[in-house]
């Protein structure tokens, strides 16, 4: 069992929005192909990190990796993300990229959409590559949306939330673009909470009362 950080509903001054792209859905068998993070201080961007990862760089000798023949990802993932096999060929390996990525993130609060998915991949990779645990506390925009917007929406994909808040989604499915969209969605949801409940604590109490009545 992964010993991850705690799920929060907060509005911190400093946080990191993260997103990843992978070869598939299972962190035990699939690999990272892109990681991104944007740091916000006082809710304004101050820095960003974005890099592709060659998922075989750390697994095979360089002379076995052929730019024209080596298959790193499926056609489905290529079509979904716009990341091609040729783009991944020249990328660095997971260990090198993750070392810089986790240094960029530091101990800050993490925000992401369905962020447990991202955390699971990063957690497993860091444990495998460096023997360290990834335990930052996190805010999941999916979790907030399911409670906050359940009367307005039937689905809570990032696209659904972007459409609901009239946020441009045309460049989605690259990691850093998804970070930007997730940040904008998060800020809009926090605005809704403050407008409708006054404070996050009032929102928590309202949710708690609904659970007890339900």
Q: Where would I find each of the regions flagged by the language model?
A:
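Acidic two-metal-ion nuclease catalytic site recognized across multiple nuclease folds
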Residues: 1-10, 164, 183-214
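Conserved non-catalytic scaffold segment of RNase H-like nuclease domains
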Residues: 2-123, 128, 132-136, 155-167, ...
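Beta-strand segments within the central parallel beta-sheet cores of soluble alpha/beta enzyme folds
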Residues: 137-140, 200-202
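Short alpha-helix plus adjacent loop in nuclease-associated cores
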Residues: 138-154
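Conserved catalytic/binding loops enriched for acidic/polar residues
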Residues: 178
